[in-house]
Amino acid sequence: MERITTTIPSRLAGSENGRRMAEYSAAALTKAGVAARVFEMPGLVSFPEPAEMRVVAPVEIAIEANTLGHSVPTLADGLSGELIDVASGAFHEYEGRSAVGKITLSELSYHPARHEKQRISALMGATGCVMMNWGHPENTAVPFGSVKPVWGNPTPETYKTEMATLPCVGIARTAGLKLREMLKAGPVRVWFRANVENGWRPVQITVGEIEGQTSDFVVVGGHQDSWPGPQATDNAAGNACVMELARVFAQCRDKLRRGLVCGFWTGHETGTMIGSSWYVDHNWDRLREHAVAYLQIDQPACAGTSRWSAASNVELKRFHQAAEKRVLGARPAFWRRAVKNGDASFFGLGVPMLAAQGAFTEDELKKTALANLGWWHHSVENTIDKLDFAFMQDHLRVYAAYLWELCTAVVLPFEFVSVADQFIERLEELKPGAEAVGLDGAAGRARVFRAAAERLDRSAEDWRARYASSSAADETAAEILNACMKRLSRALVPLASTAKGAYGHDPYGYTPQGTMIPSLYDLPRLAKTAEGEERWMLETQLVRARNRVADVLDDCRRMIDDTLRTLS
């Protein structure tokens, strides 16, 4: 931690320190006996600079600001306009109001992420964005951040349709709250100049691998690039954890049924997941055939956290919660369904994901405007004292427990009844007003899939018990079950967690991503839309999405039937 934060600060993708960090990660892995390699690729990254901002009416006030990454630069004379407070910046904040021609004021919570706040502001006709920091009301830290919605490097299509289109700046919470109070008294006009260089640069990721007894493997990773400053929690701490896990697992390589791939990504902060998406794209065949799970480690052991927070695809939930209970005992813990944030570039591929770390209490979050990553997040205040090194030891033990079971279990520790239940619950929730789409048939297939999942889970439990009682048991059945579980995840994860599906990436923070089966997100709107062109086009889209759901659930039921038939 000290080495990274003091000798390689400001690890921006495309910078010399970004390259040095990639080389340091490779050297640390090599020293631990792990084969490592640095890969270089072109990345569309951003080098934002300090912005200039002031209130011009009703009084003139200068405000310290940072240009946000991938902001559109303003012209030399800047941008001025009337300010409108849109709070979280989500769609519902605009209801009954017009942002056309105005500059929006929003606050940093990740509901939605900055990237989505910008996208929504543009859709609503705004001309620019001012985003205030989170934290306690006295927080004077001026945040960095990115507003590029395109996940990874753009394609010709997404470059035209998903890149940021507005100039955006970040300001301290103290300044944002002052603007909010001024708006309560009447109109406020602001001016700002956004200064940024956006362009293609060579960027680097580091990948290390410990081979197991079979061709299958688990991926553990996190981003190694950072904003200016030490950025201790984000993500020097995560990188240090992966290095230590690699060192320990390398000493146990002869016991690993599955290998361990260690990924140190880049372009997370200033390129929106360039490194991890490149890795998935360029290792697709091997990942699709042999990757069993992805553990993301990003911002572990923030100072002041006391609970345990885990987010996963639900097929992993039972196994990782059991590991957490063994290691953490009575420490409060909670779970949420994994959504596509951080380096969740494996969703389209269909590899289930787990991310977990310490969390603040609800009371602490209320006091800090939902600063779940610390008031210092994305600022130069992110120094090494923002880490709880005692809690870090618990993090390492939990991560090791996750990886050990994933790498050594004879039968993968997945269960699919919970997956089926999520589909059933969501489809039932969406059914009112969805008659035109034929959702009943898809819901019926979800119930049939659940019955098949019950049979699969029972069979897997039976075989786990057999293998536990005899180390000499033939593992043919395990191979058949594991192959089925991987194929199920390949089909179910993209359906449950993406709108675009397997071969594209939804924009970062995309609002439908917060829901189960994002492709059906607009079903409630269909019932409220009058007959006419808009409704007919939306209905066409949703019928096709419904067909995708029905087909995947039916295909998964058939996979299970075929697997159980083979086992019998």
Name each region found by the language model.
Residues 112-114, 202, 226-315, 339, ...:
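Acidic/histidine-rich catalytic neighborhood of metal-dependent amide-processing enzymes
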Residues 1-13, 27-33, 88-91, 98, ...:
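Catalytic-core environment of secreted peptidases
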Residues 393, 397-568:
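C-terminal non-catalytic alpha-helical accessory regions
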Residues 2-103, 110:
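Noncatalytic luminal/extracellular "stalk/propeptide" segments of secretory-pathway proteins
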Residues 201, 302-421, 483-512, 516:
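Active-site-adjacent substrate-binding region
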